[in-house]
Swiss-Prot record:
InterPro entries: DNA_helicase_Holl-junc_RuvA_I, Hlx-hairpin-Hlx_DNA-bd_motif, NA-bd_OB-fold, RuvA, RuvA_2-like, RuvA_C, RuvA_C_sf. It comes from the Bacteria. This is Holliday junction branch migration complex subunit RuvA. The gene is ruvA. Residues 65-142 are annotated as: Domain II.
Amino acid sequence: MIGRLTGILAEKKAPHLLIDIGGVGYDVIAPMTTFYRLPALGEKAVLHTHFSVSETSQQLFGFSSQQDRELFRMLIKVNGVGPKLAVGIMSMESSDFAKCVLDGNLTALVKLPGVGKKTAERLLVDMRDRVKALDTTPSEHSPTGEGAGIVRVDPVINTNVIIADAESALIGLGYKPTEAAKAVSAAYNDTITTSEDLIRAALKGMI
């Protein structure tokens, strides 16, 4: 089992990223909470991973902290919640998700991508005791790379690419194309310089 990856961030297009380790590229699926903390392309990234095997696929999921990986593992134990839906749910910070569950906030949960009322109700029941065991104390996540957290502005900003990438990411998380386009359009402004910034702003308006 692969528990952690340390390598060069070669590609990133939410929710997928590619980590190059000694010339071998590892395709990793990561939640947006991890994407927000990624370093720039070409820099070293460290990810805590979970290897998922099913009858039809083998997938590697990556997280910026052990806490997030633990939440992912808790989520996929819930009936009806697979890895893809768990990644969508983790568009919300683990501490915020735990608070929603403990507060019984059904309204907030149904706004998460792919989560309907029945799934939200199941999450409230099945996750209540589990999140109590999760360390949700606000703290700095372990950096995903040496340059993580540094704001970089690309001198050439292609607005169309940023918008297209953001919409694609939201659709990949489980939102309908019309929902994604509407959220991205509402969130975009001239201060946004990366697709990650736009995705974060769009999700903030939806969740």
